[in-house]
Structures are given as structure tokens and as C-alpha cells.
């Protein structure tokens, strides 16, 4: 407990924050500002360049030479919109365009750059220069954690508060800026509530020799033994221990920014505390945007949650080639672990609709949480501590090399197995260990020279284009983790990007959105990303979209033929129809799967075969065939069969003579297939 006064000097130095912002932006975009910092930002160009460096293509198009005020404001709006949607910043963390363009409320610009810098630190992909958050110390209210956007605030030596947030914790009265108050951590007491308190401040008023001898120790930080002139925070359990604001957080090891807590001798920063209740997040947390919540608070919010490990605060400082220890929340004593048997043990979503194909603990979780709740090695449920590495979690006893079964340590250099995705130790993943490698293509051991592509070993003659099987001796292009020669990759991009001429009906089966997080590729059962082919209710990665016939397995880059809701190439489709049809031409004995059919004297013919054969004039037997369209009985000798359906001559669609097979274009059946819906539309024009 300390007796304190309000100060007239803000704990936040705006000039220092703006100087750090300018230096950070120049280091990120590798370009110096030509003039005054604020004036250089007015056209929005530097801001758009900044966010594109942090999150590539966040602002794909902006005016790089704006000549009008409207164009400049539009660039600023593009930056604000991208910071909100791409980086997860909230409206309260963003400045308005007039704040920058009219040079008002400059403090709000610093607030936005501060939160953008924090979001960049949390990004898993951004590896560039980082913003020094210490230069923004005291920017937010230490009580409500919200930004102070005006001059209506009160400050202490190390903290500042909205005037409305500076209230007595006992009587809830607003603290008078002209009077002294009493403070302990984030709690304040007015003088009236502290009247009559026993020995309050007695140690400060006493002049005993003992207190005098300990004066030097009382003025030093218990953590770094530095000076406490700029303020301190007392330990909640040991009032004699004091910690300065320069100490680092004991959980994330980042410098302490603004307010922090001390519990059980551990210093915890705001980022390692629950956004709602302030509780330490050392046992794990739930993340929502860039805010973090403890388990009870996250459950009360009833929003989609994802369990993160306790070190998730600064994963950007970690070496991602090394595993990290995490603590799961699937312990049976946890409130969230006591679920119904038909609900996911992590998010309460029903798992009834999920295919129970594993027969182990993975069936206890919904598809998005299978990896979070189960071991990547034994598929057993994770209880207590676990090791998180390569997008998987492992029991400590299961964290072994996938090849030699050697126990792995957290400091070991490991590599991801290209087949199972599990970790490999250094010797097993080394390129020098030739005898332990098999060619990824032919599966035979590699004893001589080898080449490596996409983290997989090949014989020199086995590295071929995934599409045309051309031997790849020079550069190649990766598409969905498969090698393609440059011509095939260019052709693939033409079909999927819309550069290829498309028919009027139908369209490409490749889509870039529209699936759920629980949807998986039906071939590799991996999460969907990038361009995906949708056939009826099934999804395929672009590299997995091949003919269903295993003996063929041809990539379906230029079209497909559906059978039983599965895609086939043209050759395999014809084979299927030939094997299923019951009608064979009486002359050539070949199956009749398309074109015009003649039925004479109980026999069926291809029209071309019947026309080329001389027949005696005889009356034909009555036909028992019904038209598929009008349902009437076909009385003549000639009818048309398309896609194993019979039509009278009046209702028959035109047979197609085209043999081109592209997505949605006319097939040799005389119809158009919409790959997204599977709807078939007969072509009426030749």
C-alpha cells in the first residue's frame, strides 16, 4: 500500500511514440520519409505499403500517385479497412481518416500503429522488424485497458487512467485530482475510506533506525535490483518485495508494457492476463482475435474458441524448427471436459454428423479440434502437458523419431516427415544418410546419386512432371505439394484463373471459398486451402483431383465425367458405360452408348451400321421402348439414345459431334454438366 499523488505529466510520451512509429515504418518498407512524418502519411501510400509488408496483398490496389484529396482519403480508408479485416484490429483501436488527413487527434494515429505493431508480433508469417512497444508505455488506461483518446485523464508516475475509471474500490466515488489517494496494484482508496486504518503508512512516518538501515533495499527492484524512481508494483503476497516496470514478464519474457501483476513471485504482463477478469493465463487461454481469455471467461462468451498454449503470446520469437511445451485443457477435472458423449470435448459442438472412422479418442472431438485434443502419434487423448510441434500435439512419451523411434528432446533439431507429418531426428532426416532413403516415386532405395524436391528424395530419372510425366531436370513449379513443369503449371493456372475461354454454360469446378472448416479433401483427408474442386458434395485439392480409376489416376485438368458422383476421365467413362450397357449392335457387336439407335425385328443397331447394311423389306416388331422425355411408347423403328436414356425422334436432342472436353463444355453425350451442381442441360445447337 502506498500513498500517492496525481501528476501533471502524462505517462505517455506522444513524441517518443511517433518517432518510434516513423523509424519502424521506414525499417519495414525500407524507405525513408521525404518530409515531416505526419505530412508523409496524409496520402496513405506509406500506410498501404506498411500493411502489405506485414500481411501481403492486404491492399492489392491503391492509388500510388494520388493528386486529389479524395484519392488520398481513399488510400487511408483502404488501410483502415485492411487493418480491421486482415489484422483483426477493432474499431476502438483504429483512427478515423480525418484524424490523419486534417491533423487532428494525432494521438489516435499512434494508438492504431501501436495495435498494428502488436498484431504484427502475433503474426505467424511476418518476420520483419518489430515495433518497440516500450515507447508507447502509458498509452492505454491501466484500469479498462482501452485507449485514452482525449485529455480527460489522470496520471500517476507509471500509469494513467480515464477520469471515469479512477474510482475508489471501496465506496466507488470518483477520486479528486486535488487530493491524495492510496494505491495498491490497480486498486485505489480515497482518503475517507482509509481514515482510521491501523498503521497505514506507519513505516513511512517512523524514524526508527531499522527503517533507516533498510532504506537502500526499499529503493531497489526485487527482480533486477534497479532503481524504483520511476515507480514500482508491490508483490501481492510479500509487501517488502517491489518490482520496477523495466522487469520482464515471467510467462512471455517480453518487456513489461504499462501495467502488470505480481502473483506468487511471478510478474505477469497484460498480454498474459485474461482480457475480462485479469487472471494469469499460465494454464492456457482461449483466443478471440488478438484478445485472450481464461477458460471460465471464454466459456461465458459463448463464441468459437481455440485452445492455445501458454507460450502462444510470443511465438514469433520462437524457432519453429524446435518443439514447444504446451498445456492442454482437456483434463478430466476441467469444466469443459465434462461433456456429453455426443459433443466435442473442446467446443461443445455435436459430433453425431462426423464419420467415426478412427475408433480411438479422435472420435471424441469435432474435425477442427482432432489435432488439438489428441496425440499425433498414438491418437490418444491429451491430458496435462503436451509437446506442440509441426501443427501437431504429442504426449511427452510419444514424442519420438518417426523412423528410428528415438526419444526427442525439445532442443533437438527435427524435420517433418513427408509421408506421416511426424517429426524425424537429425540423422534420419539428413541428406547424407543415403541408405535410409527411398525414392518418393518408385519407392525403391536410393543407393547412388539422388535429387531432392519438396523435401522428398527422388532418383534423378524419377522426378517427373505430375501432369505430363516429363523428366524435370531444371526448374519446376510446385502446385499443391506436387512438382509440375512450367508449361503444365502455366496451363493449369489458365484454367483456374479464367484466362482460358470458357463456355457459356457451366464453369470451372475449382473454387476458392464456400467450404466449411470441417470439410476435408476426400482423397488425402487434409484441410482445404487454395483452389479446390467441388463435385456434388465432395471436395478435392487441385493436385488430388484425378480420375477415380486407380489404374488410370490421370489429372482432370481439362474436364471430367461423373459416375456415381465421382469424377472420371473420358476414356474411363466410356469403359464404364460399355460395361454397364445391355444393348449391343447386331452388326458390329459393339455396345451402344450414344447416338441414334434403330430397333428392327427385335434387334438394335447403330444407325450408321443399319444404313450401311442391306435389309429385306419386312415389317418390324412393335417396340416396347418408352421415350424418356414424353413417356409415350416409341412406335417407329428409330429412336435416339443419349446417356443410356431413350428418346423418340420428336423429343430427341441433337447429338454432339464435338470431342472437346473442357469444364462445363459440351460433352460427347450431347449435354452440358455444371460441375458445381451436377445439373445436366441438353444442348440444342450443333
Swiss-Prot record:
Induction context: Repressed by limF.
Protein name according to UniProt: Calponin homology and LIM domain-containing protein
One Pfam family it belongs to: LIM
Lineage: Eukaryota, Amoebozoa, Evosea, Eumycetozoa, Dictyostelia
Protein's job: Involved in the regulation of phagocytosis. May repress rab21.
Record's keyword annotation contains Zinc: yes
Residue ranges of every copy of the LIM zinc-binding domain listed in the record: 139-200, 219-279, 373-435, 437-495, 519-579, 583-658
Domain Calponin-homology (CH): 15-120
InterPro entries in the record: CH_dom, CH_dom_sf, SM22_calponin, Znf_LIM
Keywords attached to this entry: LIM domain, Metal-binding, Phagocytosis, Repeat, Zinc
